[in-house]
């Protein structure tokens, strides 16, 4: 009889005074020695007269139920074990008695593959599948024992033990359960080469596991061998192979496969439909998914909760939220009750859209139907409110986690900590972190990174360094993001030496360096004007085959232009163009700044006009940079012309406070205070609020003309607008 399922034996051991075979497997002492050449040959090859006499004595003692059998077992060797079991082939009670007594008296007996195989056959025939599997596991885990030796041993003892093919089913299942799938496949191939038949249930276990870990080609090889062997497949086989096609992205072959198996009398069931609907939904092929779903009733199947959940999730993931709500309503009309998975999909999509009203509506509906939200639902809600800055609501949902009988995990805590860090409430974030640890919830790298980012943003580098040291002491390995956060923090404070030390630490620890890390360092050294180090960092990045991004080029070009290295900036520009990287508005503005700082505002204007002709759309900074450049060159007519061009030609670009301040500065420097006064009034009329720099410039202009009356008038206006003068006044 073919055994389809491994279950603990219900057969009672006739000798209850003996310990069961599990004693053989629980011993921690080594019980095997390397297999000798005799272990894979016939037991009679080196079977002596004394061994034969010993076997007779053991068999006689077993039949008589004598207690002195132990005295005989002490002289036993593996070949004699095999011979005893051969003699017991027609009396399984004696065979079991022998196996149990051997295990009880000599748990460390040095078995060979042959002796274990004979025991396995007897135990399988006796229905003691759990004990047989224990013996198989011992054989499988033996060092230096190949699949060929195991299969040969089972084969050579097969007939003499009166065994059946269910032994080989058990072998395949044991490999699968031990997660030794490559070995299971090899054993299956060997068994088929010897003409043994493996049941479809064991084959399903093998191909199902192969598909699950992505070894689809091996699974198809087993399936084809099953088909050749004439073993009848069943609907489980069908579903496994349909899943294999879906997993391999070969959806177009499903129809042909189903036609082939239906010719064999095997037809799809509801699992088949759900598998295909899930595959189509995950790829966003929703029309195909709906077509299958609508076809189900005609085949005698009703879409269930799993079916609806799959479709709703697919619609949500591919941005079709309104359609997902329609399917949800249809689900309710069909009498099905949504579960937490249903609501999770809707909540996550509503949260992603940032729709607070809709999200709360879905959550409220969920609670009204007595569906308990899971941690993912709560984390989605909390994430929505922390992103929008509504920490009170986020905290309310955090407390609801506990009220629902759930234990907040590190994801839940990290979301709330991140919200407080964004608000600059570091002390509250740290209190939450302490609560998290007290609750036995371990911090991971993401949690540390979140707090580190908050500390660095608040320029609390000392605290950040302490937290980083704590992280490493807890044996948590920082990732590239961790160190990039710290590098950025030190760069922003001008601690470039500390930043470089962290960068070197990344290299020493072989932490993956990415373009973000390099960009951070480039920006830090570029802003302090250390062009040589910036170029060294660039060269190091390129040598490691890390491709610069448009941001990388923008940082380097800006650094070069800020120092007036226009020729080098153009070399970088040309390299960027040669790599088909389209210049960004930031890069163009940097080039314009380079011209202006070199005293060539006219060339900067020509550059801007050329870029506009090539489709570049300038922004306020583009014009402001040029206007300031012409003001520095005391070319006020050009500066005014650009303001007019900015307003009229570009449509939508409105002069801002920097634009007006640049013009004011030019007039004040030339002692043209009437013109400066006109610009100030026009600025206010157009709704552009002057800033402290505006008033300071005007006051200094009047003071330079010894016009203290006007200077004090502007000073009073400045105070009325809430600005305080600086120390220079």
Swiss-Prot record:
PPR repeats lie at residues 112-147, 164-198, 199-233, 234-268, 269-303, 304-338, 339-373, 374-408, 409-443, 444-478, 479-513, 514-548, 549-583, 584-618, 619-649, 656-690, 691-725. The keyword Repeat applies. Residues 26-45 are annotated as: Disordered. InterPro entries: Mito_RNA-Proc/Resp (IPR051240), Pentatricopeptide_rpt (IPR002885), TPR-like_helical_dom_sf (IPR011990). Coiled coil: none annotated. Residues 27-45 have a biased composition (Low complexity). Keywords: Repeat. Pfam families: PPR, PPR_1, PPR_2. NCBIfam families: PPR (TIGR00756). PANTHER family: PENTACOTRIPEPTIDE-REPEAT REGION OF PRORP DOMAIN-CONTAINING PROTEIN (PTHR47933:SF45), PENTATRICOPEPTIDE REPEAT-CONTAINING PROTEIN 1, MITOCHONDRIAL (PTHR47933). Belongs to the PPR family. P subfamily. This is Pentatricopeptide repeat-containing protein At5g01110.
